[in-house]
Each structure stands twice: as C-alpha cells, then as structure tokens.
Amino acid sequence: DTGSTSTGGAGSSGTQGLDSGPLETTSTGGLPGTSGGSSGAASTSGEPAAVCGDGVVEGDEECDDPGDTRCFECVRDRLVFVTSEDVQGDFWTWSPQNLDYLCNHLAAVAGLITDNKFRFKTWISTSEESAAERVFHSRGRYVLRNGLVFAESWDALMAQQILNPLNVDENSQTRNTAVFTDTRPDGTAMPGSHCDDWQSDSFDTLVYWGLSAATDANWTLYVGDATNPVSCDIASALYCFESP
C-alpha cells in the first residue's frame, strides 16, 4: 500500500490549496548545490565542531533531532513526487505564468504546504533554464511520499543511482506514467522549443518525456520508445522536487 506511510511535507499538515493571492517563493541563497551537510568537521573559527545527534543545529547541519523522521545524518530529506494531474504543453499559460504552480498547488491540497509559499520546483527545462538549474542540489536524500528513497543525494541522482522509481504522487498513490521533462539524465535541456517554452499545445511542436516507473536514466529521458518526443498536445504528468 503506497499510501500507508508518509514522510510529511514542506509545511505542517493542511488541506487547502494555494489561494488566489500573491505567492512567495523561497530562496536557496544562490546557485543550487549549497545544501546541508556533514557534521563533525573542524571549525575554521576555532569554535567546537558541530556534533550530529546532540540535538543542537549548528555548523552546516540542517537539522539535529533524532525524533525527526525527515532528518537523516543532520541533513533534511527533500520530498519528490509525480503529479496526480496531467498537463499539455501550454501549462505555463494557465498556471499564473509560473512553471511551478501545479506542483505547489497539488502539494498544498495534499497538506504538504500550509503557508502559501512555493516550496516545490518542477523538473522541467526551458530555453533559458535547465532542470538542473531549477531544482535544489541537496546533499541529503530525495524521498518519496511513501517513505522510500528515490536517490541518496544530488550527486547520486546525477550518477543515475536511482533506488526507487519516482512513481508516487502527492497523495501517496502509485502512478506509472509518462512525464514531461525535456531534460537529459545530467539535468541539461534537450534541444528543441520546449513546446514554445511551455506555451503551446500544438501538434507540430514536440516535447521529450521520461517514465516514472524507471530506475535508471529513463526516468527523465525514456529511450525505449520510438514516440519520444511526442507532440505538445499530448497530456502528461510532471515531476516535483522540494526546494530548498
């Protein structure tokens, strides 16, 4: 039963979706890749090194609570999910001009967000920004809604060390489906118009997709089907990554 265990969410529990007012975005403090980390390293300031497990968050620790199921080796787990809803290639035009709206709306409805802030990024590439530039490069684990680990870290993800398929939606339900990505396994953008940067659902524009059931590079770019890419009028799911 994929819904029996939940890892919690980006906020406390709740049932409302994002409201119609302005939405705040959270900042990663610069380029992705600066997350979390190792505890116990010597301090350069002469202060005692952080000790993971002492209950005190210090140094490069993101968390330090033995009772927190989302804290692993003093680095916070990041939730990932595949959307329960499908979109066509023009989803940017109906989602308040924000590529991340659907991820955050569904997360809010599922109780993963209650503070009206965008806490998830869509794994999608555009002509100006690749998926790797969009999502947070965590030193910690990317975890599914059922508690299973998708990848141990950003580095593991880039090495295609996929432990479990990213086939669980925001409601903890299994969903094996095609997913729009336009993204290579290394996170860079595939060539093409990206459905005119996600503003076209025309049959004569194309988009590359991944397979949520895959546990290898096919998760983001499925190569086992001659119909990849497909036309942008096809409906497909999206991947969502908690950031930061």
Q: What are the language-model segments listed below?
A:
Residues 1-53, 63:
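Ser/Thr-rich, Pro/Gly/Ala-heavy low-complexity intrinsically disordered linkers and tails
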Residues 48-76:
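Extracellular calcium-associated, cysteine-rich motifs in secreted modular proteins
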Residues 75-244:
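Secreted/extracellular ectodomain signature
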